[in-house]
A protein has these predicted regions:
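Transmembrane helix-bundle core of multi-pass membrane transporters
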Residues: 123-191
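Hydrophobic alpha-helical transmembrane segments
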Residues: 15-20, 45, 53, 74-78, ...
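Structural signal for alpha-helical transmembrane segments and their membrane-water exit/capping regions
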Residues: 21-37, 65, 141-142, 185-194
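Short cytoplasmic-facing helical segments at TM-TM junctions of multi-pass membrane proteins
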Residues: 193-203
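Single transmembrane alpha-helix segments in multi-pass membrane proteins
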Residues: 25-90, 115-120
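Alpha-helical transmembrane segments within multi-pass membrane transporters and channels
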Residues: 91-131
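Transmembrane alpha-helical segments of polytopic membrane transport and secretion proteins
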Residues: 1-20, 28, 37
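Interfacial loop-to-helix junctions that mark the boundaries of transmembrane helices
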Residues: 7-14, 39-47, 90-96, 161-175
Length: 203
């Protein structure tokens, strides 16, 4: 009886379900997608999702506490737009524009933490508010115009050579993603911060 329960709990665990869904989708598109398994398709897929996965590492800590952050996409967009405006219209050097991008997104994180921890606003409501706030600020600052960062070949394009450069056709961003995954996994499993987050979410 215990053995049957352990097998059932194994197959019903979230990790197994998530992995099974991923394998199913991969097999489905491999069978019915004409060019899905080509090298160009795989590289393009990795290049388009690695930064989203990096954002998901941070979201894992938030969800493990029993909370949620609805603003993460709009905050990333707002930071990128303000950084683009800083470089294109305010004529700041690219390193300053990147620092401004980080500071803007960090400020929204601090605001979310203040609203949730100090003002006792539910995470769903607080982050929904900052989501629209970030979206509005991004639209106002950029005037709903596309902001372009320097191309790889320009002197200011050094950061793209760091993050977008390929290693024998393999995107460097994916390598950074794997490194961040190892760091985040270690923090989540073996550090006080990770265990504290899980303890809060389990209570």
């Amino acid at each position: 009886m215990k053995k049957q329960k352990s097998i059932k709990s194994l197959f019903m665990s979230q990790r197994i379900i998530a992995l099974s869904c991923l394998i199913f989708l991969f097999l489905f598109f491999s069978c019915f997608g004409k060019n899905f398994l080509t090298q160009n398709s795989m590289v393009s897929l990795l290049e388009s999702v690695y930064y989203i996965i990096c954002l998901a590492f941070g979201m894992t800590f938030v969800i493990s506490t029993g909370g949620i952050d609805l603003s993460i996409g709009c905050v990333a967009m707002c930071g990128a737009l303000i950084g683009g405006v800083s470089y294109n219209q305010w004529h700041m050097p690219i390193w300053a524009a990147l620092i401004i991008t980080v500071l803007v997104t960090t400020a929204f994180g601090v605001l979310n933490g203040f609203l949730i921890s100090c003002c006792k606003i539910p995470p769903f409501v607080a982050t929904m508010g900052t989501q629209y706030l970030a979206q509005g600020i991004g639209y106002i600052v950029s005037r709903v115009q596309t902001m372009r960062y320097p191309v790889v070949t320009s002197p200011d394009g050094w950061f793209k050579r760091v993050f977008y450069k390929s290693l024998d056709g393999f995107p460097m961003g994916v390598i950074y993603m794997v490194i961040l995954f190892v760091i985040a996994s270690f923090m989540f499993r073996y550090t006080k911060i990770g265990k504290y987050a899980c303890a809060i979410g389990s209570n």
